[in-house]
């Protein structure tokens, strides 16, 4: 009886984790872009603008899917790297 209880708890935890992972699968954060699963057409421009990205986009391949990758704004310290002398 105790084993069944532990089995049910483990199953519930697994299901919750799978739902959490599935919710995040539509957007993937890469270093300089945020990618969304969609067709790579002019709709990418609308997707990026609706999420607040104004620096353009490109078609990317990720997790065996193709999608719109919206370019992030770079911070000033990322654009200009200090010289190390």
Curated annotation (Swiss-Prot):
Keyword Secreted among record annotations: yes
The UniProt record lists the keyword Nucleotide-binding: no
Transmembrane segments: none
Disulfide bridge partners, by residue number: 35-70, 40-59, 44-68, 48-69
Primary location: secreted
Family note: Belongs to the DEFL family.
Protein's recorded name: Defensin-like protein 76
């Amino acid at each position: 009886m105790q084993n069944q209880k532990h089995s049910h708890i483990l199953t519930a935890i697994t299901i919750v984790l799978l739902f959490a992972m599935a919710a995040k699968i539509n957007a993937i954060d890469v270093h300089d872009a945020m990618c969304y699963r969609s067709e790579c057409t002019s709709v990418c421009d609308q997707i990026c603008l609706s999420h607040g990205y104004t620096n353009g986009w490109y078609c990317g391949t990720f997790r065996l899917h193709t999608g719109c990758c919206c370019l992030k704004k770079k911070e000033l310290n990322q654009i200009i790297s200090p010289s190390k002398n």
